[in-house]
Amino acid sequence: MKAIYEGKAKALFETEEAGVLRVYYKDDATAFNGEKKESIDGKGILNNAITTQLFELMHDNKIPTHFIKQISDREQLVRRVDIIPLEVVVRNVAAGSLAKRLGWEEGTPLLAPIVEFYYKDDALGDPLLTEDHIRLLQVATHKEVETLRQLGLWVNDVLLDFFGQHGIDVIDFKLEFGKVDGTIILADEISPDTCRLWDKETKQKLDKDVFRRDLGSLTETYGQLLTRIGGNGQ
């Protein structure tokens, strides 16, 4: 069956049930807007398992998501959504582009979590947007932006508590949202592809920065993370 959409890390397929899609997690790893690419055996299986566990965690905390269930080691069933073309980034610690933009040392704690919005457009390099830009682009209303902000901070609270129990700091993460019948829900994935996660004591990176910065084996790192949070693949 032909994918109705194929991105850098996942492919989406129709199912026989209206409003339900099948997500296939690929082994492709990319960084720097696709400039660095590699196929890493087993990556998709690990991301599927981790995302499944974290979406189930969101459900337990009453956060609405598109996730229905995991159906194989690489696949999930999800609700079909109309994606909002914004990436919602929540940051607790200065790292990556924020550290570079502010001239801060990576690892500097923020006084409070901040929420940033980026335009989902690969051709433009997913630029950082202000709320004025969002209004000009007409991709979300002021009310929707506030909903995205509050949902992002809610997810942050849940992740901070969960990973904190496993000795892991949540540095920052990227979320995507969509609409179902006008209601905004969490979509895409939550995985070490989309989060920065550091060991609390050693500051070891447990995320895609291992691939970005050639710090070691991505599958070993993701497998270690999955084991630490008590998850398992199918």
Curated annotation (Swiss-Prot):
GO molecular function term, any single one: ATP binding
Reaction catalysed by this enzyme: 5-amino-1-(5-phospho-D-ribosyl)imidazole-4-carboxylate + L-aspartate + ATP = (2S)-2-[5-amino-1-(5-phospho-beta-D-ribosyl)imidazole-4-carboxamido]succinate + ADP + phosphate + 2 H(+)
Domain of life: Bacteria
Family annotation (InterPro entries): SAICAR_synt/ADE2_N, SAICAR_synt_PurC, SAICAR_synth, SAICAR_synthetase, SAICAR_synthetase_CS
Keyword Transcription: no
Biological process terms in GO annotation: 'de novo' IMP biosynthetic process; cobalamin biosynthetic process
Main EC class the enzyme belongs to: ligase
Pathway: Purine metabolism; IMP biosynthesis via de novo pathway; 5-amino-1-(5-phospho-D-ribosyl)imidazole-4-carboxamide from 5-amino-1-(5-phospho-D-ribosyl)imidazole-4-carboxylate: step 1/2
Enzyme Commission number(s): 6.3.2.6
Keyword check for rRNA-binding: no
Record key words, sorted: ATP-binding, Ligase, Nucleotide-binding, Purine biosynthesis
Family: Belongs to the SAICAR synthetase family.
Listed name of the protein: Phosphoribosylaminoimidazole-succinocarboxamide synthase
Gene for this chain: purC
